[in-house]
Amino acid sequence: MAFTHVCLWTLVAFVLTWTVFYLTNMKKKATDLADTVAEDQKDGAADVIIVGAGVGGSALAYALAKDGRRVHVIERDMREPERMMGEFMQPGGRLMLSKLGLQDCLEDIDAQKATGLAVYKDGKEADAPFPVDNNNFSYEPSARSFHNGRFVQQLRRKAFSLSNVRLEEGTVKSLLEEKGVVKGVTYKNKEGEETTALAPLTVVCDGCYSNLRRSLNDDNNAEIMSYIVGYISKNCRLEEPEKLHLILSKPSFTMVYQISSTDVRCGFEVLPENFPSIANGEMSTFMKNTIVPQVPPKLRKIFLKGIDEGAHIKVVPAKRMTSTLSKKKGVIVLGDAFNMRHPVVASGMMVLLSDILILRRLLQPLSNLGDANKVSEVINSFYDIRKPMSATVNTLGNAFSQVLIGSTDEAKEAMRQGVYDYLCSGGFRTSGMMALLGGMNPRPLSLVYHLCAITLSSIGQLLSPFPSPLRIWHSLKLFGLAMKMLVPNLKAEGVSQMLFPANAAAYHKSYMAATTL
């Protein structure tokens, strides 16, 4: 018995000794890491390095600098970008922009006010405006369309007017890493010299073609769903420039919208398996023979104008990529380098600005960004808090894009017709869907409700006037299609984040209320 007691007490003493040693060692490592980064920050070094000075990088630089952070931004090309994406700012995005103090960046760029959609299908037209009487939305319920490059340059000027923001033109080659902690970047400056920059926090915000994403997440590979083809018709103005014109054409959707007082963006989706060549003229033939006849007469002249005048045709892959946090400390990824959804909902900038707003608020209490463990806690919190907005937009974009593809399958076409009927029926259906689309009501559960309502109404149309065996079969196929659209997004975004309303309520209270942050 005495021997047993001795063994037991020896074991207890060993466990206690090991625990004390482990905790002391962990504390020492955390202290050493903080001291190392603090040492790196001497002599005016940066608190934060931002890779990329697009919409996200510039907006984040401004927000963090206003909080007193020293920010070093490294951008590959400071010329005004010529992009086809990022030309439409939803009402929710404008709210986020104003909360960051950047609302004036939409001024003096000839941005056009947009009050909603005009939707066309099979010769019919209907309006789907943003809800005006929405007591839950604390900002003017309208969108803006513009030249992306002009907007980016405004953001850059605003950010780099602050004395604690340093802008440098250069190409980031890799992240500097030490024992699983990112300490900075290696980059080539404008003169072609390879150099390094150190900071306790590095933000990767270099867009959908990010060359740093793979070094942080092996499984973060973007999936190309289709291609968006577009061009600008110049020196013209739409009859209804305040609307984004969405045409449910075949093989997929077509969009026409005003991006300045004299320029109109024309674009359409092409599926990968049937992509016409631009070089040999197949694309122009495809546009004239397939797309143009489906464009409504009041839009057709402007749509043709760009083709006939030889407007530069741009092709952009429509990518999808779920967000995944990096296991490495001292780094966070934002924007299209972090999370992408189909661009048909034109909400990428809105999600990005929401992310910046959240990250800024979470970082504000931290006086020392060199504590990698505390910063990691902030990043983990950020990932959860962003879900109401990101999950709503991601699910809506990815589901909506599948519905808009034309098909000879009766079930798929019934779903497509059901979306048109539901979106354009007026009342709470239209206002509810447009509030979701515009980022005015980022509640995933509300989106699930509307998707289920569209499915049930589409099934009702299929079964009408009498539920024959063939109609029942098509209805079952339609239900299966709806589940294929919804379930993968539930899995990707998280069931709890999608179906529990408390998260959305907390997000709305913290980030969409009328009070400024």
Swiss-Prot record:
It is a multi-pass membrane protein. InterPro entries: FAD-dep_OxRdtase, FAD/NAD-bd_sf, Squalene_epoxidase, Squalene_monox. It is an enzyme of class 1 (oxidoreductase). GO terms for cellular component: membrane. The keyword RNA-binding does not apply. FAD binds at V55, G56, E75, R76, R83, F88, R156, V172, D336, M349. Its EC number is 1.14.14.17. It is found in: Membrane. Keywords: FAD, Flavoprotein, Membrane, Oxidoreductase, Transmembrane, Transmembrane helix. SUPFAM superfamilies: FAD/NAD(P)-binding domain. Expressed in seedlings, leaves, stems, inflorescences and siliques. This is Squalene epoxidase 6. It comes from Arabidopsis thaliana (Mouse-ear cress).
